[in-house]
Each structure stands twice: as structure tokens, then as C-alpha cells.
Amino acid sequence: MKRMILAAALVATALSTSMAWAATAPVQKMEADEVANEQMVLYFETGMIGKSVWLVDSRPAGKFIGGHIPGALSLPLDLLKKDAASADKLGIPKTGKVIFYCAGRECTLSVDSAAIFRKMGYLDAWVYRNGVPGWSQKAQPLLAEEAFVKKGNLVLIDTAPAKDSIVTASNKLVQLSLSDLKGDKGQMALGTLSKNAPLVVIDRGDMAAVNAALEELRERDFRRLAYFPLSAWTGTLAPAPALTALSWAPVYGPGQVAPKVFEEAVAAGKFILDVRPAADFARGHFKGAVNVPIEELEKDFAKIPKDVPVFVNCASGAKSQKTFDILGRKGYANVSYLDAEVSCKGELCSIKE
């Protein structure tokens, strides 16, 4: 994001432009059980999460450890469906206000979780429909877990020069003061780095410094951002390596394909399997896609061919990965899946990894 010089003329132009856009932009309709971005931020900033408001992340555990709203509890929808007692283990009083979230408005994991909780007697159950994208849109921090750091293929950012830090063979480390991060040294280290690279700022007990570093990284258009408390690290510390220009490439698991590969499959007319609910599919989907909601997959899997490549998508990657596993157990060896956020209007779809 290019920095703007806040000259009076530019401010006036920006204001007039934003006012004109506001007059024509569609208003997002709030649902009856929905918590808005501003309310969610207020709960966080006033320290209510975990005290008078309970926040539950309905995404798979692998997504949770990569970055979640601070104070959130992890309860994947799949686990909740398999083991109702998993809800009790969270220690949430049935009279308490509990809010579920996942990967944004296209993701229904949070909606389904809230519905289950209401049936279990939690009457004050809400949904933060904007989820992680909405939280990030408000420039709020996401907290990573140690398991994510140990998993590797990250870029760690430490703004405490000359101090021992988290040095591992599977991650890369940039150790610069905040001023250097904003300057030429930061540009040298990060200037050619993929904007999709996951960056984790090391928290040494100063959240103001963490937020300043995260803001600088947002200014540089990095979007996969989180922070991790050094106090939570159980490994050893070591001196940081010499500063170099960094590069990064994604590592895909079995069956997972890059967004570009998936888009090429759509363009080539390959068999695209959309496992979202029928109502979501009706609002928009990839051109030529076939809808078999994951809830119906066990009885309708025969609709899916075994003799041609099959590419699976959902809204966030959670259901598509599960579909890959289900079909694999049924003998399908021709399935690939997209683990990314997907948003569609009609047949116009965007993918955000």
C-alpha cells in the first residue's frame, strides 16, 4: 500500500471520493443473530472476551493455530458434531453470551455451530459473520499458536535487535528495529517477498510495538499476518542470522492445489465440485460447477465421476479438504482441492489464499 502524503488537497479529494462511493455502495444487511465488526472490536478492546463474552472459533484446528482472534476458544464444527461433550469442556455457562466465527460471510461453520449450541440450551448464541476477514479489515491482530511456528515455512519478524530470538531451520527471521523495518533495511529484506507469505511478529510483551509492526506490514500489502508471544515459546533462543533478502514459496499438502491451478481447471471445463450448502451455491459459484453439499456426500458420492480429474472447493477450504479425505476413503484417486477463501457472485468468483 503506497503511503499517501496527507496534503490538504488530497484529503479533500479522498473525502469527496469516499462520500460518493458511500452513496452508491451496497449496504451489507445484518442478520438477526449477527455481531458487527465494531461490536466485536469493542468486546476485545474492553477485555470482555473470556469474561462476560465467550468467543469460539469454528474453523479446523489447523486454521486456528495459524491465527485467531485473541481470547478465542477452538471448537471445530466437525468435533462439535462428533462429540457434543466437547462444548461442555469449554466451560461456557449456558446463560453466557457466546459468539462463533470462522472465515467470513461465505463460511457457514460458525452458523452451524451456533445452531447446535442453541439446541443444547445456549440461548444467547451469536455469530460474527464477518469472521477473520472482518477482523483483519479493522486492522486487529490475530494470535498464532506455538504449533504453527513449529510447523514452519513462516517469516518471523522481531523488532528487538541484538537479542536472542526464535531461530529454527524451517522458518526465516528478520530482526530489525521498527524504524529500520520501515526503512531501507526492511525494504531490502521484504521487498521481493511474496505478499502471500505468512508473517508472524514476535511479541516481547509490548503490544504497542507489535501493532506498529503489523501496521507497517499491512502498509507493505502483506495480508497473512499474526503475532506470537515469545513467552509462549518452549524451544531455545539463539542469535538472529544476518539480514538477507527473503523469498518464500507455499508448501501444499497431498491433494491440495494452488489457486492458479484451480482457476486453470475452471477455465478448461474440468469437473468442479462445490460442497457448500445449496443456498450458497445458488448465490454464486464457479462456472460449470456441480453442487453436492458435504452433508449429502455420503449418500450422493456416486454423482462424482472417478474417471476424470475432480477439483473441490468450498468457502474457506475446510469442507473441501474434508471432502478430499472422504472421497479418498471411497476409492477416489482423482481428487484435488482448494484450501482458500472463495467468494462468488453469479459465476464471478474470487480466490484469496
PLM regions: where:
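Rhodanese-like catalytic fold shared by cysteine-dependent sulfurtransferases
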Residues: 4, 20-42, 62-100, 104-271, ...
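Mature N-terminal segment immediately following signal peptide/propeptide cleavage
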Residues: 41-46, 53-62
